[in-house]
A protein has these predicted regions:
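Short conserved loop adjoining the S-adenosyl-L-methionine
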Residues: 103-107
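Class I SAM-dependent methyltransferase SAM/SAH-binding core
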Residues: 55-102
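A conserved beta-strand element that flanks and buttresses the S-adenosyl-L-methionine
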Residues: 114
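C-terminal alpha-helical "lid/dimerization" subdomain adjacent to the S-adenosyl-L-methionine
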Residues: 147-203
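A short glycine-rich, Lys/Arg-flanked "PGG" loop and its adjoining helix->strand segment in the class I
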Residues: 128-140
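Core SAM-dependent methyltransferase catalytic element
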Residues: 210-227
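Conserved class I S-adenosyl-L-methionine
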Residues: 1-43, 46-52
Length: 227
């Protein structure tokens, strides 16, 4: 079995990094992702699991709209920070659990699963295993929402795409991701090509109902488990 802690990225285990995590992430708005679930019928009676939940940028607002949200992260420090944020928000229906794609099991089937910028932490073989496990956690017709850094270009375009990416990076590492951060991601993380990821998703028992890309690097998928 893969050591999920070893693939978490050392920064996600570091308390100082976590304290500035939301600022570095740019405070992403969860509304689009929540709306994607609601468009497929999820509501205040629904159960949702958030894998790689981090500091709860999705999980906390999602707890206001869904019946039960379980936030899962491999980092003990992230889980601790998330529990504090959930308590401050009065989110009594938000459970915070240490675990990952390969280790967590919800017991009863759930209605929706969300993951943002976490699937790239595992190699492609383990992405396939993770997605099959996720399919097993969802009820028939359940919804998977994926956001991740995915390469939507031919290998020969990599130099030009990465040069543009680096040019738009933050100068201050406290305020955002720098060119050095992006270069480290390419070297050490497991982002994959779109033309590899999508067949893995469908082979895992999902129909891709919606997909959108920001530039050639950031993909968002809404997937429905086959009945």
């Amino acid at each position: 079995m893969l050591d999920e802690m070893a693939h978490a990225g050392p920064e996600h285990l570091d308390q100082q990094f976590i304290e500035g995590y939301d600022r570095k992430q740019g405070y992403p708005d969860a509304e689009t992702d929540i709306a994607a679930f609601e468009a497929h019928g999820l509501d205040q009676t629904s159960s949702v699991v958030d894998f790689g939940a981090g500091t709860g940028q999705f999980a906390v607002p999602a707890a206001r709209r869904f019946g039960r949200v379980t936030a899962v992260d491999v980092s003990p420090a992230m889980v601790s920070a998330l529990r504090a944020k959930a308590a401050a928000a009065g989110a009594g229906n938000l459970d915070c659990v240490r675990g990952g794609f390969l280790s967590y099991s919800p017991g009863e089937p759930v209605d929706g699963i969300y993951t943002r910028h976490a699937l790239h932490q595992v190699p492609d073989f383990w992405k396939a295993v993770s997605l099959q496990r996720i399919a097993g956690m969802l009820r028939p017709g359940g919804v998977l929402r994926i956001r991740d850094l995915v390469y939507d270009f031919a290998p020969g375009e990599a130099g030009a795409v990465f040069a543009d990416w680096f040019a738009g990076a933050a100068a201050d590492p406290a305020a955002g991701y720098t060119a050095a951060d992006y270069a480290e991601h390419i070297r050490t993380e497991h982002s994959t090509f779109r033309w590899l990821l999508e067949p893995i998703i469908t082979a895992s028992g999902f129909t891709i109902s919606d997909v959108s890309y920001q530039g050639k690097l950031y993909g968002a998928y809404t997937c429905v488990k086959s009945a």
